[in-house]
């Protein structure tokens, strides 16, 4: 038998913090991947890849697809990046893979890294050069 609802609404008040926590968790997850993408936007070609994907799909582009487009762009332009930009990109990817946020790790792994690998796999020498740039967690994935 369920407990009767308190006249003063205290049970409802007790439920509110749980709902608020869910909103906070969802907001943090969204901020985590958006912050990650914002970090990559410091590289012009990745900003253009993001803009092109959003132009094609709209602002509500599936996140994994967006990350896949970013991975494809990294692979296609790998040799054009300066050593500093390359290090920045792969350090950012590794930070994403080491993040506490499970959603961010999933987007980086199943979107960005899988797309990066699919593109690089066609050229063994490129794949080898990229693997040298990957951090331990990214390489293990």
Enumerate the language-model features and the residues they cover.
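A contiguous, surface-oriented mixed alpha/beta subdomain in the mid-to-C-terminal portion of proteins
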Residues: 48-64
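Amphipathic alpha-helical binding modules
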Residues: 103-141
């Amino acid at each position: 038998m369920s407990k009767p609802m308190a006249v003063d609404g205290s049970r409802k008040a007790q439920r509110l913090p749980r709902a608020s926590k869910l909103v906070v968790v969802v907001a943090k997850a969204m901020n985590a991947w958006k912050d990650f993408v914002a970090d990559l936007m410091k590289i012009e070609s990745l900003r253009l890849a993001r803009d092109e994907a959003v132009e094609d799909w709209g602002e509500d582009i599936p996140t994994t697809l967006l990350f896949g487009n970013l991975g494809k762009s990294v692979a296609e332009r790998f040799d054009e990046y300066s050593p500093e930009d390359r290090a920045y990109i792969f350090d950012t990817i590794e930070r994403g893979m080491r993040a506490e946020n499970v959603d961010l790790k999933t987007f980086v792994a199943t979107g960005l890294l899988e797309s990066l690998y699919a593109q690089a796999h066609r050229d063994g020498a490129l794949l080898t050069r990229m693997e040298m740039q990957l951090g331990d967690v990214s390489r293990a994935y």
